[in-house]
A protein has these predicted regions:
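An N-terminal, well-structured beta->alpha segment
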Residues: 1-43
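Flexible interhelical turns and helix-capping residues at alpha-helix boundaries
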Residues: 27-30, 101, 178
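Glycine-rich phosphate-binding loops that contact phosphosugars or nucleotide phosphates
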Residues: 42, 46-176
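Internal, active-site/partner-interface "lid" segment
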Residues: 135, 149, 175-215
């Protein structure tokens, strides 16, 4: 390799800046669909399942984890595993969040249709609202960081960070709506440095929303 250190660092910094801008742009894309998603997830009496394939699957796993940490019980559901029987775990009272940038992943669209047949609503997170997923979902939220945040507009890098940020906002807002406190967070997160925190952080501002389920104290 003969690339200079300066060129290497400049390229790396340009990538990070583009990705950072893509994430920042998500703030302006939050609209009525986000509010509707908060209300829909807040009314769920069962569990929230989150699915995706490839890099979207990695984001889905992270989103499910953070929803659970923040007081909204959620489970990552691998798309192909679901079509080999795991879908049986999804029942009436649950909800499915399907993540697909292009909205044309056959296994995710098949899964989404099948859970709808069981009376389970589907929220789609996609950059393409006119895609198959975008049109079949009960609620579609558009998360579009633009093609420039992904190399060649193909390799999902910045776009996955943008979708992750949308999920972070969902988890944090629901936490504040439910009044889910730090005591509850630490009860379910006893391991690692978080579990050894001696002084609780300041309480988050409370939000009010019609229909949101308040989860029981730990």
């Amino acid at each position: 390799m003969t690339t200079s250190a300066a060129a290497t660092l400049q390229t790396a910094r340009d990538i990070v800046r583009r990705e950072g801008q893509g994430v920042a742009d998500v703030a302006d894309q939050l609209d009525e669909s986000f509010v509707a998603a908060v209300e829909l997830v807040g009314r769920v009496t069962g569990k929230v399942f989150v699915t995706g394939s490839g890099t979207s699957g990695a984001v889905a796993r992270r989103m499910a984890h953070l929803l659970s940490v923040c007081g909204t019980p959620a489970v990552f559901l691998p798309g192909m595993d679901a079509l080999h029987g795991t879908m049986g775990a999804v029942v009436s009272g649950d909800l499915l969040i399907t993540i697909s940038r292009g909205g044309e992943s056959d296994e995710l669209n098949d899964l989404s249709r099948r859970v709808q047949q069981r009376g389970v609503p589907v929220i789609a997170l996609t950059a393409s609202p006119t895609s198959t997923l975008g049109t079949l979902a009960d609620l579609t939220a558009v998360v579009d960081a633009g093609p420039e945040v992904d190399p060649g507009g193909v390799i999902a890098m910045g776009s996955t960070l943008a979708t992750a940020a949308w999920g972070d906002a969902l988890a944090a807002v629901l936490m504040q709506i439910r009044g889910y406190g730090w005591e509850q967070v630490l009860f379910t997160h006893p391991a690692g440095a978080v579990g050894r925190i001696e002084q609780l952080p300041d309480a988050l501002p409370s939000l009010a929303a019609d229909g949101a389920e308040r989860r029981p104290e730990a």
